[in-house]
Amino acid sequence: MPRSQRNDNFIDKTFTVIADLILKILPVSKKTKEAFAYYRDGMSAQSEGAYAEALENYYEALRLEEDPYDKSYTFYNIALIHTSNGDQTKALEYYRQALDLNPKMPQALNNMAVIYHAQGEQAAEQGDMEMAEALFDQAAFYWKQAIRLAPDNYIEAQNWLKTTGRSKLDILI
């Protein structure tokens, strides 16, 4: 039985019913409907911390999904799982894939910046200030892009950019 049919959460069930109705009404392919079902089941598993199951569903959704915009959110969710599991290298890889398909995704840019900032902090703690500065510059690069897309968000990042003197760095978009 698909995860979406065994979910006990009222809101998730309501969303599932509404989404299924919309998919029945809209003229979309069977493949698109299947991709959405896997994506939805992946989100459900992810919200319950069942990351292995979520990844299986997301990979199947990626295989079936044809729309680049929809695929970008699947890549983003896969990146979130890898971030939660502490695999920053894989997380960055999937955030990049999401951004390749959807460059206007400030949350992916922010999450990449957070990873680079954390890596910079680790390098600083280990006394490698040159590496720390390079990683902080990477964090600034991604935070500035995120802030350009969502200027009312990421207030802490904006403050960090100002206090570290990185708010004036030129970045290529």
Curated annotation (Swiss-Prot):
One of its GO terms (biological process) is photosynthesis. Transmembrane segments: none annotated. It is a peripheral membrane protein. TPR repeats lie at residues 35-68, 72-105, 120-153. Keywords: Cyanelle, Membrane, Photosynthesis, Plastid, Repeat, Thylakoid, TPR repeat. SUPFAM superfamilies: TPR-like. Essential for the assembly of the photosystem I (PSI) complex. May act as a chaperone-like factor to guide the assembly of the PSI subunits. Belongs to the Ycf3 family. GO terms for cellular component: cyanelle thylakoid membrane. It is found in: Plastid, Cyanelle thylakoid membrane. This is Photosystem I assembly protein Ycf3. Gene3D superfamilies: Tetratricopeptide repeat domain.
